[in-house]
Amino acid sequence: MSLILGRFHCLLLLAGLSLCSTVFAQGRSVDYEVQGTVYDGYFVSAGKDAPLVMLVHDWDGLTDYEVKRANMLADMGYSVFAADLFGKGIRPTEVKDKRQHTGELYKDRSKMRSLLRAALKQAQSLGGNTDNAVAMGYCFGGAAVLEWARSGDKLKGFATFHGGLATPEGQDYQHTQGKILVMHGSADTAITMDQFAALTNELESAGVHHEMITYSGAPHAFTVFGSSRYREDADKKSWARFTGFLESELKE
């Protein structure tokens, strides 16, 4: 079912009346198949020439949270494809189920990469400008985005919000092509500052252009609206930096 966001811009007339025009960003769920399994993504277009953002969900699966973030970006002039890495209808609510679905992909990095590339291909089929694209991810999605960066695929940039930072054994960033932006809460007990420092050293050694930012007092999942972990200051600052990253890396 299509989801439509409207933005209303009112022009005041000299007579004291107002005339409102409506600009619509249309978003919709998109079913696509990868190796016999159906996945359910979300695509919102800001126009055929708009830069593209590939968004990867956290361990809850693709939910209203990612849809909201996608629509926020569309309102700024970016087309967005929110990928589904779990499968249609799989939106785990229990921790054990979340661990199961993320764990399966952590153990099968080849499948993770295939799903990311399939999502990019689907975005392209819908008119997304894949030659002018950045990938972003939250938590598990952040780890997936770094996996994508290590694959050597040619995206303009890779951004993570409180994402997993550890590099699997046998992998490195020698083939990474885009710039990397990492936004991390210094009070995150799930992903430690030791991992943050280790990634910084890896990227520096590999010669990857990177920016690593920490936010004091911010725990894991500090951007999730309405949760006990939400930190407004860190959320607003990280979002502002991310949108600045998009402006600098994507051609208008």
Description of each model-found segment:
Residues A197, E204-E252:
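C-terminal catalytic histidine-bearing segment of alpha/beta-hydrolase fold enzymes
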Residues S29-G128, G226:
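Serine-hydrolase catalytic machinery in alpha/beta-hydrolase-like enzymes
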